[in-house]
A protein has these predicted regions:
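Conserved "HGTGT" condensation-loop signature of ketosynthase/thiolase-family condensing enzymes
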Residues: 1-80
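Active-site-proximal gating segment of KS-fold condensing enzymes and close homologs
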Residues: 23, 80-99
Length: 99
């Protein structure tokens, strides 16, 4: 009988960040820095760079998972991806491209 399970996870966080103050400034006075930090809880937030698409970030997270677990990539049958994109048309899940 085949067993199913999660043996590890990986993460990728973009190198570029925006601060709560920068977010407040972009609202042109609608939100103060204090409101962004205290009410929304955002002190700094990662922001994807030019090369940080959903699939690219997913692949980097997958490489991190492989490094953390020592699993041979050829032994993986399925990849679950929780990356998110918004478009006005149907999209294929990034997990298919990452695998």
């Amino acid at each position: 009988m085949t067993t199913v399970g999660i043996v590890g996870t990986g993460i990728y966080i973009p190198e570029t960040f925006v601060t709560g103050e920068e977010i407040a400034n972009k609202t042109q006075g609608v939100w103060s820095k204090e409101a962004v930090v205290e009410k929304l809880g955002i002190r700094k937030k990662p922001v994807p760079g030019d090369g940080d698409g959903t699939q690219e970030m997913g692949a980097l997270a997958a490489l991190d998972a492989l490094k953390n677990t020592g699993v041979n990539p050829l032994d993986i049958d399925v990849i679950l991806s929780v990356g998110e994109e918004w478009k006005e048309y149907p999209l294929t899940t990034s997990a298919l491209y990452i695998q």
